[in-house]
Amino acid sequence: MVLPTVAIVGRPNVGKSTLFNRIAGERISIVEDVEGVTRDRIYTTGEWLNRKFSLIDTGGIDDVDAPFMEQIKHQADIAMTEADVIVFVVSGKEGVTDADEYVSRILYKTNKPVILAVNKVDNPEMRNDIYDFYSLGLGDPYPLSSVHGIGTGDILDAIVENLPVEEENENPDIIRFSLIGRPNVGKSSLINAILGEDRVIASPVAGTTRDAIDTNFVDSQGQEYTMIDTAGMRKSGKVYENTEKYSVMRSMRAIDRSDVVLMVINAEEGIREYDKRIAGFAHETGKGIIIVVNKWDTIEKDNHTVSQWEADIRDNFQFLSYAPIIFVSAETKQRLHKLPDMIKRISESQNKRIPSAVLNDVIMDAIAINPTPTDKGKRLKIFYATQVAVKPPTFVVFVNEEELMHFSYLRFLENQIREAFVFEGTPINLIARKRK
C-alpha cells in the first residue's frame, strides 16, 4: 500500500525537527541498535488513529551553504511536489516574519492541504498571540509546543483529517521490488536490461499522483512483478535532482513500498556511506534485500576478486549477513537472468510460515547444543516459540524472565532458525516475552 506523505516545512529554528521527532516518537520503538546501521531522520513513518503516513522533514534536505531564501523555497518546492499534506511550522515567539510570508505565498498556490502550526507557544498567555498568523491566509493556526508535546495531538488530528482516502490493498500475489543506489550506479540500465530480458510487459501503471512510474511484468512461470521506479519519481525529481539527501528520501519512500530491495553498488566506485544508510533503512523496515554489484565487466579481475569483494561487502554491511550478493553487468547482461528467480525466492522467504511444532523442535535442539544462559544463579527457561507475522518473519519466544534473554543468545536462536528453514535474503525478528 502506498502511504500518503506529510511534509514539514518552515524556516530554520522554528522547531521542525522537534515536531518531526515528536510525531515519529508516537509510533517508533527501536527494538535493538544494529551496528553499522545509520539512521536518517529526514524520513520516517508516523501513525495516528490507525492511519499510517510517511513523514518528511524538508529542513533536513537543505544545503546549509545555500542562500537563506533559496533553502526555504527548496523546502516548499519539495513539499508541494511530494506531499499530500503540508505542515507549515512558524514560531509563536517571534511572530510573523518576512520569511514566513514568503513561504506562505508559495504554499498558497498549491491545492494541497496546509496545516499552520504555531510552535513555541509554551504557556497559555502566548495563545492570544497566534491570531496574528491569520494574516498568512492559510486558515486556522494551531498552537503548539513541540518541546513539551502540547498541541501535538491537535496537529495529528488535522493531518489525519486531511489525508487522502485510503486506497484498496494491493494484490498480495504481485511481488514489488525496487532498485536502490547512488546516482550513476547504473539503475536505469539495469531496469531496461531486466525488462528486456524476455519479459512480457503488462502495462505501465501510474503508481501515485506524484508521477512515480511502476512497471508490471510477468515472468515465464506466470509470476507477476511490479518494479518501482525510483529514478525517480521522474517528474518530481527535477526539483534539486542532484541533492543527495533528496535522493535518499525518494529511495526510502520506494523501499517503503517494496517487498524486495535490490541494493545496487557501482563496481567502479566501491561502497559509500550512502549505500550503508539506504541498506540500513531497508533492513530496519524488514524488507528482503539483494546486494547487486553492477558494472562488473568494467573492472580488472583475478582469481581473488570475487572473494575480496564479498569480504568487503560483508565487512561494511555486517547487519546484512543474510543478503545474497550477485555480480552483474547491465551492459553485457551478465547474470541478469538470475535476478527474477532471486527476487521470487526472497519473497517466498519473506512470506514463509513455520508450524509451531516444527519451530519448537528446532528451538529444543538449539538449547541442547548451547544451553540457555544464567544470571546470578538464575537460568533462562524457554517454554515455547511461535511465529506471529510475515514480511518479515517474526517469532515470539516465551520465557520465564525477559531480562535473562541476552542479545547474543537471541542471535544464536535466530541463526539456528535461519539455518533450519532457509530464510534467504530476509531479516527475521525474534522477540522474547515473559509467559503470563
From Swiss-Prot:
Q: Where is the EngA-type G domain?
A: 4-167, 175-351
Q: Which CDD domains match?
A: EngA1, EngA2
Q: Which residues bind GTP 1?
A: 10-17, 57-61, 119-122
Q: Which SUPFAM superfamilies match?
A: P-loop containing nucleoside triphosphate hydrolases
* Positions of GTP 2 binding: 181-188, 229-233, 294-297
Q: Where is the KH-like domain?
A: 352-436
Swiss-Prot/TrEMBL GO biological process terms: ribosome biogenesis
* Highest taxon in the source lineage: Bacteria
Which keywords, in A-to-Z order, does the entry hold?
A: GTP-binding, Nucleotide-binding, Repeat, Ribosome biogenesis
- Which GO molecular function entries does the Swiss-Prot or TrEMBL record give? GTP binding; ribosome binding
The record describes its quaternary structure and partners as: Associates with the 50S ribosomal subunit.
The entry's function note states: GTPase that plays an essential role in the late steps of ribosome biogenesis.
**Assigned protein family:** Belongs to the TRAFAC class TrmE-Era-EngA-EngB-Septin-like GTPase superfamily. EngA (Der) GTPase family.
Name the UniProt record assigns to this protein = GTPase Der
Q: Which organism is it from?
A: Streptococcus agalactiae serotype V (strain ATCC BAA-611 / 2603 V/R)
The gene name reads der
